[in-house]
Regions:
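A generic fold-level signal
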Residues: 9, 17, 60, 139-141, ...
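Active-site beta-strand-loop-beta-strand hairpin of nuclease catalytic cores
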Residues: 16-20, 158-159
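Short pocket-lining segment of the protein kinase catalytic domain that shapes the ATP-binding cleft
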Residues: 66-74
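An alpha-helical support segment within catalytic cores of ATP-dependent transferases
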Residues: 103-154, 159
Length: 159
């Protein structure tokens, strides 16, 4: 079976054989983060968001891997790259997708505002910067609406 690499990221590579998609994490990637991502993806799917359904999580040759359904379509990044004259149309689509995600609620997921607060407090930033960031964050509402943790044109498929 032939596998095509479709994306390379900082912590993983994504392959497909046109039937399934495989997200292969870098060697020795933290097991807890793999299962956390699997849990989050499953909760998002259960909420009704169209995401690839994870079929299995495996460990082989020091690499954690998700196997999921392949979704046909092009990333917004590739559409923008191949058709730059219509970048405004694609950015409008990205805004549409992003705002539609906020309509979903996932009460079992960590609250994004709490996560960001913890990240800021535990960061190596100077105290003044931490205070400024926490002040800005405190102006945001606290809710359990779904927030995409890595929303980029690379992560939006248009079918």
């Amino acid at each position: 079976m032939n596998f095509e690499i479709i994306n390379t990221r900082r912590n993983n590579k994504i392959y497909t054989n046109r039937i399934d998609t495989y997200k292969v994490f870098n060697e020795n990637y933290d097991k807890r983060l793999v299962f956390l991502e699997s849990f989050i993806t499953t909760e998002v799917e259960a909420a009704g968001v169209k995401v690839p359904s994870i079929k299995e999580v495996t460990f082989n040759d020091n690499h954690w891997c998700f196997k999921s359904d392949s979704i046909k379509g092009d990333t917004l990044f590739s559409l923008i790259k191949n058709d730059p004259d219509n970048v405004d149309k694609y950015l409008d689509k990205m805004v549409e997708v992003h705002t539609s995600i906020h309509k979903f609620k996932c009460p079992k997921l960590p609250i994004q505002k709490d996560k960001l607060t913890d990240y800021i407090k535990l960061s190596d930033l100077d105290e003044g910067m931490k205070i400024d960031l926490l002040d800005m964050l405190n102006t945001c509402p606290k809710h359990n609406k779904l927030v995409h943790g890595n929303f980029t044109p690379h992560n939006v498929l248009v079918s």
